Amino acid sequence: MGSKLINVEGGNNQDDNKYNSNNVISINNKVNKNDYFIETNKELKINLNFQNNNIISNIFSNINIYDKISNIFINNKKTYMLKYNNNINEENFFISYFEKKDDNFVPISPWHHIDLKNDDGTYNMIVEITKYNYIKLEIQLREKFNVIKQDKKKGKLRYYHNSIYWNYGALPQTYEYPKHIYQNKSKKNKEALLFTGDNDPLDILDIGSACLKIGQVVPVKILGAFTLIDEGELDWKIIAINKEDKHYEDINSLSDIEKYYPHTLSLLLEWFRSYKMADTKKLNLISKQLYDKKESEDLIMKTHHYYLEFREDVKKLKEEHSKETIKEHDYVNAQNIQFNYDKLNNNDDEPMENNLLEDINITYYKSDSAYKPDLNIWTP
């Protein structure tokens, strides 16, 4: 299928390096070339040159939901705006964020500047991928202002091979810092296998019924979490429900999910166990130790402290004028990804990957004092 652009009601999407720190958008000057269109369907352009034609129907079904959602929103008494730039499904598409200062909107980072928690006890979820979508969008840690862009792998835009059935995103001001090492001890493996986090903000899923908007900041209630080992890295997933869902008041735990959205949890776990099979030919591993609400909130706060520690480590390293670059993981300590995966699956009776949940007990091991933070990650 050839490339075709659809522009719903126009909108100014020229690539003017819109997340340059000098770029401010006036909310009073209506003739400014950066004048912002409030409704998403007047801003979004779509390139229909998809790898999978099923994506097209999903995109259009989502557009119908977007049209009445304002791109200007208030969170914790602060006014924010998100803006779509260029054409979705192209390399130069990105979502940028702004905060209102006096009469202007100034660029901000969704990772650094959006609050993690709200006054009512909810947490803020930054939506990267909407329900039923294939396009793998992600906060870009190494780009200025950490804009959201489509992820790339081997130089090509990345897509899920199967659409995701939940709204997926990240928690601001959290970080799975590879400086911290975790271990798995079991009867099967007498020696401890060591793992580190995946060097990204903490992932979160909304199990609510609605398709949220790409880039939207949504208050959610935490329900639980699970530990995923994805190609040898720890990758925790927080499970939540958005505040506007019709069952928000009814669902307060993982067990409540089954009452109102039957089979959601088992489908969710199976999806994350198998979604990389088309690429890696291997199943991910999920620990049978599911987190309850309190344990999940403790995990969120731990990764928030990791985020603060990372910011402090970056500051110290810059002050020392060091030019050292990141050690992706200290594999002298953390061993080897392939080795860890093979060891976890070394069972004479039955391969671990035949089970939905595995007997993997992940506990904290230690902090690597020699670890250097990645100075390529953008910080204010």
From Swiss-Prot:
Q: Which UniProt keywords apply?
A: Hydrolase, Magnesium, Metal-binding
CC cofactor: Mg(2+)
Query: PROSITE patterns, from UniProt?
Result: PPASE
**Could you say which residues bind Mg(2+) 1 here?**
198, 203, 235
Q: A Gene Ontology molecular-function term?
A: magnesium ion binding
Q: Which GO terms describe its cellular component?
A: cytoplasm
For this protein, the record's SUPFAM superfamilies field holds: Inorganic pyrophosphatase (SSF50324)
* Statement: the UniProt record of this protein carries the keyword Hydrolase: yes
Q: What is its EC number?
A: 3.6.1.1
Q: Which reaction does it catalyse?
A: diphosphate + H2O = 2 phosphate + H(+)
Give the binding site residues for Mg(2+) 2: 203
Example GO biological process: phosphate-containing compound metabolic process
Q: Which InterPro entries does this entry report, sorted A to Z?
A: Pyrophosphatase, Pyrophosphatase_sf
- What family is it from? Belongs to the PPase family.
From the Swiss-Prot or TrEMBL record, give the protein name: Probable inorganic pyrophosphatase
